[in-house]
Amino acid sequence: MEARPQQPLEDRALLAEVARSLVANPVHVRVEEEQRGKTLVLNLYVLPQDRGSVIGKKGQTIHAIRKLFSAIGFKDGREVIVELATD
């Protein structure tokens, strides 16, 4: 199955929207993408004080976000990894 050409932009926009809904400072959410072969890495940047909201209790929130994007990628025959990055 061939991935749609706009898919990485859609993935990046979706991750940004999900993150903005979780944090206290949504204007500071930034997502950068990095292509590694068939793997798309989405680096999510938030303010240090918002990291806990994205990680969640015992890492449950970031785990759920990663599972969601893994499933989205699997559907298109590719791997999508979400990394919580720091500046």
Language-model features, listed with the residues they occupy:
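RNA-contacting regions in translation and RNA-metabolism proteins
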Residues: 1-53, 63-87
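Glycine-centered tight-turn and secondary-structure capping sites
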Residues: 55-59
